[in-house]
Amino acid sequence: MGKNVVVLGTQWGDEGKGKVVDLLTESAATVVRFQGGHNAGHTLVIDGEKTVLHLIPSGVLRADKTCVIGNGVVLSPEALMDEIRELEAKGVPVRERLRLSPACPLILPYHVRLDQAREKARGIAKIGTTGRGIGPAYEDKVARRGLRLGDMLHRERFASKLGEVLDYHNFVLTQYHHEAPVDFQRVLDEAMEIAEELRPMVCDTVSLVHDTRKAGENILFEGAQGSLLDIDHGTYPYVTSSNTTAGGTATGSGVGPLYLDYVLGITKAYTTRVGSGPFPTELFDEFGRHLAEKGHEFGATTGRARRCGWFDAVALRHAVQINSVSGLCLTKLDVLDGLENIRVCIGYRSKDGETIDTPVDSEGYEVIEPLYQDLPGWSESTLGVKRIEDLPNNARAYISFLEEQTGVPIDIISTGPDRNETIVLRNPFLD
């Protein structure tokens, strides 16, 4: 019988999921995206060539792999076609490998306009969204007024629904935000043109996933963003609009939770965050600048500089709990090379000296300070190391300490951006 493995981020996103998914896809028949939208940015480096994916599962670069965009993904038809064409220009036969759920909620131009208008109105209190319409599209889904990919395949149905929802959103845009309205005919014409290109890729993805499982094939479920951005369990309201945790796998793909065999949590050897929101271990000194520069910490989707800080074991323990993480993959270990001392946050303390657990909302983070334990660094390079025995002693001690703090084994260690620069202690599909 095949295995179903979930790969997701356990921090605030940007943990290096794309590389790990690409690596593990060698052992999978199918790769499934189950939430998020084109606000994600998964960077792959294969033989020195860099590819950034936003919607299409990272397994697309491997031959004979089926890639599925499940019903939990909010889909921008325009962004998807741009990504397909970009990959095809590199010689990747995307259309024969990609399958799309007809239940995907659509991101249309008015969602983007609303997203950007809201962020503008918030001023300094902005959430820090990518401005790509993700939140408004999920809102329409929950409000039961959203258009779905299946609607695009039927012109009259799509036009009727579009007219109704556009009246509503144009009222908000013009009367509340004082912005120009979105043109109905332009949205309709653009959608219908793309619909014919997407039609051959649309299918019953729930049955496809279950048929793959019944055939004894391995399936990899690829998460986007990170667990601490989860709409329910993250640092609310500085979160994304979907469930980025393991529970979202079932609702976003149609696979039952009892069929999930292993959850691999991806975490950097330090911590980063893009945009606004709590970040207890954030650094504003030369160490923070070192991590940002050596780690090339700029968002793959927005290009925004990432905030950097020490490893937060408290936050990771929380992520382990809410995901039932089976094992961890530690990425960007090489960024810590050359540091004399490395700090790990092992607890939170309130201003009155009380040790506390993870706050449930962003306000709770305003009254805590991190408790650190200092560990010795290493001067040797870990870049490209492929065996655990070849790592510096202090690097191995650091890895062991993180395992002790989180209570979860570190099964994979990434020592560089290329898929080959990896130490695999346990392959979720094979061991």
Swiss-Prot record:
Cofactor remark from the record: Binds 1 Mg(2+) ion per subunit.
Entry keyword ATP-binding: no
InterPro entries: Adenylosuccin_syn_GTP-bd, Adenylosuccin_syn_Lys_AS, Adenylosuccinate_synth_dom1, Adenylosuccinate_synth_dom2, Adenylosuccinate_synth_dom3, Adenylosuccinate_synthetase, P-loop_NTPase
Residues annotated for GTP binding in this entry: 13-19, 41-43, 306, 332-334, 414-416
Annotated catalytic residues: 14, 42
Residues involved in substrate binding: 300-306
Main location: cytoplasm
SUPFAM superfamilies: P-loop containing nucleoside triphosphate hydrolases
Keyword set, alphabetical order: Cytoplasm, GTP-binding, Ligase, Magnesium, Metal-binding, Nucleotide-binding, Purine biosynthesis
EC number(s) from the headed UniProt entry: 6.3.4.4
Family label: Belongs to the adenylosuccinate synthetase family.
Entry protein name: Adenylosuccinate synthetase
Protein source organism: Chromohalobacter salexigens (strain ATCC BAA-138 / DSM 3043 / CIP 106854 / NCIMB 13768 / 1H11)
